[in-house]
Amino acid sequence: MKYLPLSLALAAIPTVALANAEAPDPARIVVTGEGLALPPGTPAYGSVAIDRDRLANSASGRIESILGDVAGFQQFRRSDSRSANPSAQGATLRALGGNASSRTLVLLDGVPMADPFFGYIPFSALVPDRLSVVRVTRGGGLGAFGAGAVAGAIELASATRDQLPTFAASAFYGSRDATELSAGIAPDLGGGYVSLSGRWDRGGGFQTTPKDQRVAATAPAAYDGWSTNLRAVAPLSATSEIQFRGTLFHDDRTLRFKGADSMSEGQDASIRFISRGAWQVDALAYIQARNFSNIVIVAPTPTTSRKSLDQRNTPSTGIGGKIELRPPVGPDHVLRVGADTRIATGDMYEDVYSAAGVVTARRHAGGDQMTTGFFAEDDWTIGSLVLTGGVRADRWTISDGFFRQANGTGVGTLNTAFADRSDWQFSGRAGVLYHLGDAIAVRGAGYTGFRLPTLNELYRPFVVGSVRTEANAALTPEKLKGLEAGVDINPATGVSLSATAFYNKLDDAIANVTDPSNLNARQRRNVDAIVAKGMELTASGRIADFLLSASYAYSHSTVHAPGMRFDGLTPAQSPRHAASATLAWEPEQGPALSATLRYVAKQYEDDLQAYALPDALTVDAVARLPLGHGVTLIARGENLFDEKIYTRLGTDGSIDLGTPRTLWIGVRFSR
């Protein structure tokens, strides 16, 4: 990739920092590897935290499944990162409509993780046991990189040195000849530490196609992927440190037919400076080099299949950074001011094939976009009352967009250049948190936000089954307005209950709109609005050795599109009910057991509600047996009762299914 030299240059920085850092005084210097502390007004916006114990002990071992603990979290489809097309892994919250791009801002140590071209999240590269905590905030976001958080934010924090064993490794074997291997070391170095880890998982995959629809070309959803992560933290003074992270990943998958292969890969690097002195500082720079390819196979008869489209190369680059300052303004205020920028550039190359296997068209499309924002927020504590509020001003540009097409011999047939566009977008949020006592707090918040259409939505068409969805270079940004109110109750030590009522309106929502005269033809368009309102409930508690956590979301979403056939209907891929509950038995020593129940209500495949995906209820379980000397025997089970999970319904009657019963046995070692 063309930015590899810069990635390697960034990779050298932590080594130099570690080598040149002055020998620390252990009595004065504490390296945490964390960011700045959360402002006191953060709870006003409501959030759910997933702790490290849960992250390290799930049935699937995959972050997107664990995020399902937060009811209302969803990807575009119900598949996980072993059987989904990578470009469909957009993350969203609050049933704001199915969209393969992420409406939720996903951050890892402050770095936006969305693919620069597609907007999807590389979930397979986000290994849960490398993380310390995940905090999910539903609703509009602000602060650094707040542009893009129209459905909330998912903040992932890397595990700190005190959470990481010096050496850890695990090996699992699962159903359908699946293997999962991981290892990591985290030695102290100078006054800081380095963490190097890697994971490789592969499997023959399950049949996503129902038995009565399989043909000669049908193939299971095989997958093979790996990722490595290097993180280094070094002290610069008693109150400041520098943090580096580099991630490499590669992922190959097959979906539905032999030869229907997809590939995604990435090289990410970031460097972050944290100062916890009188003037607190959080400065960050990052670079991402990503690529994607995908082959579309059609099976016109039960005995034949052919390649119809080869999306052979989609290189993209993301560059960005931020600086946040917290000046000393007194003990009652936490003021944050700063700026951030994100630049995305990408190209799409694809070849179209005829029924005879001859290239009939070669397409090349792409463009650039940039968002630069300035923000200020303050939290003011007045006894039991916390007031919080902030504003953002973002300058966005969409430029150099084009779509070119040539015939099979290379003669140009189409050359379209799209006009550059730019504008300012202003956002704000405000919240209040009032503690009625030690056991109860009430809160309320209002917010606005926006999201630019991705390069993928603007310039790249895609095909799923017999349905082709066209891009739309004229798309405008989505804009959110929202209100919510809630209560948090802690009736006893270790027990917490929370309830939130919300109203969100997403204006100019980007949706895949079906052509009324051809159900196999869709186009991305801005619709008037999607309105989502509902209730979210969470609960957690520990009694003796038993731990219970639960979450439920009711989301009543409708599309406002006067004059359109889908006006008043539920947006695609938006279930009305979602729930999750985990019951665990975790004594301080000895064996441990946990079981997780998840429910997702009926949702529609399309905007016209012609194809309904039935509801699904699944049960997962994990059992751990310590064997001594740092070795633990682990058994995991996904979808234990083998529930049939529908992930897609095609206009031709074709069906895709999600993960069936999957069993794992393995060992984990840490020292």
Which residues does each predicted region cover?
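Periplasmic-side early beta-strands and strand-to-turn transitions of outer-membrane beta-barrels
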Residues: 142-143, 155-157, 162-172, 176, ...
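Signature of Gram-negative outer-membrane beta-barrel scaffolds
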Residues: 334-437, 452
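Gram-negative outer-membrane beta-barrel transporters
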Residues: 381-387, 495-507, 523-607, 641
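Conserved C-terminal beta-signal and adjacent last beta-strands/turns
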Residues: 6-9, 186, 234, 433, ...
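Extracytoplasmic beta-strand/coil segments of soluble accessory domains associated
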Residues: 64, 68-111
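Surface-exposed extracellular loop regions of Gram-negative outer-membrane beta-barrel proteins
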Residues: 250, 289-293, 345-354, 397-411, ...
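Short acidic/polar hinge/loop motifs at secondary-structure boundaries
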Residues: 111-138
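Outer-membrane beta-barrel signature, preferentially recognizing the C-terminal barrel domain
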Residues: 259-277, 310-318, 363-371, 416-431, ...
